[in-house]
């Protein structure tokens, strides 16, 4: 700001006469002094800049307050299955670690959403040895030893576990763990710490088990004579399940043994599965196999995840090499688009039209065939999804609706192509010009790395502030379960629901039924209830959310304006070879010196829109439990409206930044000028937007798919020295990395095309190709428009 407003020799305000702008929607007039982005400009939207700086100071204070009063350790405290905080609540104050009864349950794909469903208990220390109840061969002579190794829930009295039968009942009811692995604490959670190369732990008879042949069996459905069809379906499915499971178990063992990563298998008791299959118990109770199938599935998911991680650790260097190659491939593709853009676009359009035409023809043939043979269109009622889908496609009405839908899409597409064919040609020409502009100022390709780093800083900062704010407050504990307990007595007058202190509760409340006076209560406790948070913290949370959205949008706007200045300078330079070498640096300095207020204004508008959309998503999530059709419809309409509004505002903001980069006007004036210019060329705008969007997506998809195919071919061949479990894992990672990198580079290309498009529209309105008013556009664009220099 000092350079902007405190130095008169650097900045000279321009008057309205410096640049001739039209009123309302009149075309732009010729200005002999206009040579591209103005060097004489002033600070824009200073009140918005002052507001933004003030907000940043307030956000900084929020961060300082959060760090001073918050404690992240409070958020990392584990909670057992009964809701007790390990090491915090009175019953588990001396047990700070959390152990899982069946860790394989935590390998399910929906765990981040639904949580880990296995029983979880607090313990004083993590298990220091492996334990499996079935393998321990429980008998009266070793029952005491087994009981000492058991890990059970807090309300279980181990002294009651006097026989093996009682222990089995407690394990079956999930009150004690059947298996336990040696583990170490990680963030106060006991995580398995198993050495590799324990393949020998698999029973010998299991490793040498011959393939099992399935036998057909009947179910009790034979008794239902009136449901013969259902019986046949059920019999077939169960028979297939038996055969599949037999092959699945043996194949699983073969694969896991080959990859030497089966140390967990000793906990699965696979021999029970094999015995069940061999004895034929499925004939009488086919559901007996269900728990074994679930166990096999869970451990398979866990081992698959482990092998994927092993593949990544083994191949990460080559993955980085292929991603680095994708950077080079992206640059080559952008440079080549000036030659391949036209055939790529037209081949894609013709391909889509051809595919739709064939779809219409095929749908019509199917419709006629089914109408002519109605007997063949029998609908098979079956619970099988594939059968249900097949029944749909045997209906003439299904093909009629498909025919109508494809015909409408085809007609609309043909009309759009016919009406916009000339505009599509112009859009392709601008794509070629964009490729030239990016190649002329090659540093712009890597410039998006700067805003990406800044956005990463904003995300990390806002997340840390969120976590520290969430940890602020005083924990509130209340007495729970005292009324229902017949043996727990508190000598200090604690009553049910009273606010309590865990230490005082342990000292003054005792279980009178226990042998020793010092035994704590098991049926009642001082439970953590909530965190008493100061009211100002909620306000700070709101400030943090606003700061996150505003700064993310601000950084994105900064990138767009800098690139717009660079590409506008390239367009309005007649001799492209004389383009300033540090044109990108000039764009940065002009934006920082003069237009941060404009960026703050535009980004605030987008941020408000995003916040409203986030609130609507939150409300929709909360109201899903209520089955109210009217409420859902209103929310759906609001979400759709604000999505459309945000998309329009993003489009308008980008063009406003381009106009501001050229003329140095404030946000409102720039947005008005850009909107007027675009509305006078609305068909060209539509064609350019759709063609460029489609081409960019196609290019990114083509590039990412090609690099993924090369990666998979490499790892699936004999070239690499490493042996991977899944060659597709590095291929998927390379696909994702390449797509992200291509998106970064093509974001520059997108700004280039939009900037050149606005400059092109101004060029054809300001100039006529005469000696006095020559065009700035290339000869290719002049030829397409049927214009030439006079």
Curated annotation (Swiss-Prot):
GO biological process, alphabetically ordered: transmembrane transport
Glycosylation site positions: 102, 259, 384, 483
A Pfam short name: Choline_transpo
A molecular-function term among this protein's GO annotations: transmembrane transporter activity
Membrane topology designation: Multi-pass membrane protein
Membrane-crossing segments per the record: 47-67, 288-308, 319-339, 344-364, 400-420, 449-469, 545-565, 592-612, 691-711, 728-748
A Gene Ontology cellular-component term: membrane
InterPro entries, sorted: Choline_transptr-like (IPR007603)
Compartment annotation: Membrane
Keyword entries, A-Z: Glycoprotein, Membrane, Transmembrane, Transmembrane helix
PANTHER family to which the protein is assigned, alphabetical: CHOLINE TRANSPORTER-LIKE (SLC FAMILY 44), CHOLINE TRANSPORTER-LIKE 2
Family named by the database record: Belongs to the CTL (choline transporter-like) family.
Protein name: Choline transporter-like 2
Organism for this UniProt entry: Anopheles gambiae (African malaria mosquito)
Gene designation: Ctl2
């Amino acid at each position: 700001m000092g350079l902007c407003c405190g130095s008169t020799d650097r900045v000279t305000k321009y008057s309205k006469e410096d640049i001739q702008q039209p009123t309302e929607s009149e075309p732009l007039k010729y200005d002999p002094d206009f040579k591209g982005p103005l060097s004489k400009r002033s600070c824009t939207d200073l009140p918005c800049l002052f507001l933004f700086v003030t907000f940043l100071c307030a956000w900084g204070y929020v961060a300082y307050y959060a760090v001073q009063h918050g404690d992240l350790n409070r958020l990392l405290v584990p909670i057992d299955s009964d809701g007790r905080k390990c090491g915090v609540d009175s019953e588990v104050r001396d047990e700070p670690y959390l152990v899982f009864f069946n860790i394989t349950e935590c390998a399910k794909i929906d765990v981040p959403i639904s949580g880990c469903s296995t029983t979880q208990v607090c313990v004083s220390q993590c298990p220091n040895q492996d334990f499996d109840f079935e393998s321990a061969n429980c008998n009266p002579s070793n029952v005491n030893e087994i009981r000492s190794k058991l890990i059970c829930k807090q309300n279980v009295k181990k002294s009651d576990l006097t026989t093996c039968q009682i222990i089995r009942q407690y394990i079956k009811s999930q009150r004690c763990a059947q298996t336990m692995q040696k583990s170490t604490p990680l963030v106060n959670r006991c995580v398995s710490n198993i050495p590799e190369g324990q393949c020998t732990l698999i029973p010998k008879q299991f490793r040498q088990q011959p393939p099992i042949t399935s036998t057909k069996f009947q179910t009790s459905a034979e008794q239902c004579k009136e449901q013969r069809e259902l019986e046949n379906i059920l019999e077939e499915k169960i028979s297939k399940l038996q055969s599949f499971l037999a092959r699945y178990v043996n194949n699983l063992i073969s694969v896991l043994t080959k990859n030497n990563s089966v140390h967990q298998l000793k906990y699965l008791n696979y021999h029970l599965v094999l015995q069940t299959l061999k004895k034929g118990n499925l004939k009488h109770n086919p559901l007996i196999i269900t728990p074994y199938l679930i166990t096999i599935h869970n451990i398979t998911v866990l081992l698959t995840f482990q092998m994927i991680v092993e593949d990544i650790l083994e191949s990460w260097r080559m993955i980085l090499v292929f991603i680095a190659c994708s950077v080079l491939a992206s640059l080559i593709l952008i440079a080549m688009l000036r030659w391949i853009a036209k055939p790529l676009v037209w081949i894609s359009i013709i391909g889509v039209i051809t595919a739709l035409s064939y779809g219409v023809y095929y749908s019509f043939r199917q419709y006629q065939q089914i109408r002519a043979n109605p007997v063949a269109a029998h609908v098979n009622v079956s619970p099988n999804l594939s059968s249900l889908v097949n029944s749909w496609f045997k209906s003439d009405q299904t093909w009629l609706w498909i025919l109508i839908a494809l015909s409408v899409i085809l007609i609309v597409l043909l009309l759009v192509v016919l009406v916009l064919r000339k505009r599509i040609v112009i859009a392709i020409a601008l794509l070629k010009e964009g490729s030239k502009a990016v190649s002329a100022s090659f540093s712009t390709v890597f410039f998006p790395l700067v805003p990406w780093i800044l956005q990463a800083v904003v995300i990390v900062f806002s997340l840390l502030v969120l976590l520290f704010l969430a940890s602020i407050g005083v924990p509130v504990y209340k007495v729970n379960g005292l009324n229902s307990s017949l043996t727990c007595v508190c000598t200090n007058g604690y009553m049910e629901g009273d606010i309590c202190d865990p230490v005082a509760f342990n000292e003054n409340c005792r279980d009178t039924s226990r042998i020793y006076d010092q035994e704590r209560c098991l049926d009642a406790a001082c439970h953590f209830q909530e965190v008493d948070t100061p009211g100002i913290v909620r306000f700070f949370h709101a400030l943090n959310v606003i700061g996150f959205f505003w700064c993310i949008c601000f950084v994105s706007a900064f990138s767009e304006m800098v690139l717009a200045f660079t590409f506008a300078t390239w367009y309005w330079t007649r001799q492209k070879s004389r383009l300033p070498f540090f044109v990108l640096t000039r764009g940065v300095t002009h934006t920082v010196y003069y237009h941060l207020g404009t960026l703050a204004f535009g980004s605030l508008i987008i941020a408000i829109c995003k916040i409203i959309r986030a609130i609507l998503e939150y409300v929709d999530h909360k109201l899903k439990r209520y089955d109210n059709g009217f409420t859902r419809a209103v929310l759906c309409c609001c979400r759709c409206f604000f999505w459309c509004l945000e998309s329009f505002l993003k489009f308008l903001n980008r063009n406003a930044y381009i106009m501001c980069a050229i003329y140095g006007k404030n946000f409102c004036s720039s947005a008005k000028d850009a909107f007027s210019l675009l509305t006078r060329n609305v068909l060209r705008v539509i064609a350019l937007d759709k063609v460029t969007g489609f081409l960019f997506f196609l290019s990114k998809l083509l590039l990412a798919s090609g690099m993924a195919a090369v990666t998979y071919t490499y790892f699936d061949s004999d070239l690499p020295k490493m042996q991977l479990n899944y060659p597709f894992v590095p291929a998927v990672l390379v696909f994702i990395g390449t797509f992200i990198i291509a998106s970064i580079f093509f974001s520059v290309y997108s700004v280039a095309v939009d900037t050149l498009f606005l400059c092109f529209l101004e060029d054809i309105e300001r100039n006529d190709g005469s000696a006095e008013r020559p065009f700035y556009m290339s000869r290719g664009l002049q030829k397409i428009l049927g214009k030439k220099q006079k």
